[in-house]
Amino acid sequence: MVMNPDAVRNVVGIIGNLISFGLFLSPLPTFVTIVKKKDVEEFVPDPYLATFLNCALWVFYGLPFIHPNSILVVTINGTGLLIEIAYLAIYFAYAPKPKRCRMLGVLTVELVFLAAVAAGVLLGAHTYDKRSLIVGTLCVFFGTLMYAAPLTIMKQVIATKSVEYMPFTLSLVSFINGICWTIYAFIRFDILITIPNGMGTLLGAAQLILYFCYYDGSTAKNKGALELPKDGDSSAV
């Protein structure tokens, strides 16, 4: 019995939504640690800022006046948006002033950008096709940035030879999420979905490789004093 490709694609899409929800929740242990220690230590907010922007764009994309009949897009990304806001609020609460200022600066730029996109699309594009194309292209671009954001942490892992600040759960779920949505995109080939998720698969695999390469070194360091780079060395601008 040959299954309908559309039916298979829908099933993969539902699985993808569930995995995406898991991806949003995967950093939770990191923030539990931050709350317990009342210190963000060397954790960086870059992945959460990137995910915040990505989710906000996809929510906008899924609205009825941009791309009708996209309720699943709105619900999963709306949920993700709320979760990222919670993560950023926790980070802000326990970060030192320089890190707070940096985070607020990036967040302000993102909000201004979102407002500009909304105004430009609603006032300048008057058909669903044009609005969907413009916002969809932005979603692809910033979705790629979301997956690339952990490069900051990967750089830190290599510099410190420690995986302490690269959560394994986040890396694993990112990898699985990328695979799922890449398969979804290939069933009925969609380049807009393939590009960011294909990159997500590759970067997720790279993070897992780094994790297993440096896990023993991280364990050894944790037995003594863990020497971490200064803020200027551990984060990308």
UniProtKB/Swiss-Prot annotation:
GO CC annotations on file: membrane; plasma membrane
Chief place of localization: membrane
MtN3/slv domain span: 11-98, 134-216
Known tissue expression: Mainly expressed in the floral organs at the heading stage, and also in stem, root, senescing leaves, stamen, pistil and hull.
GO BP terms in the entry: auxin transport; auxin-activated signaling pathway; carbohydrate transport; galactose transmembrane transport; negative regulation of auxin mediated signaling pathway
One Gene Ontology term of the molecular function aspect: sugar transmembrane transporter activity
Residue ranges, Extracellular side: 1-10, 68-70, 124-132, 188-190
Regions that span the bilayer: 11-31, 47-67, 71-91, 103-123, 133-153, 167-187, 191-211
Compartment(s) where it occurs, according to its Swiss-Prot or TrEMBL record: Cell membrane
UniProt family annotation: Belongs to the SWEET sugar transporter family.
Subunit structure: Forms homooligomers and/or heterooligomers.
Protein name from the UniProt record: Bidirectional sugar transporter SWEET5
Gene expressing this chain: SWEET5
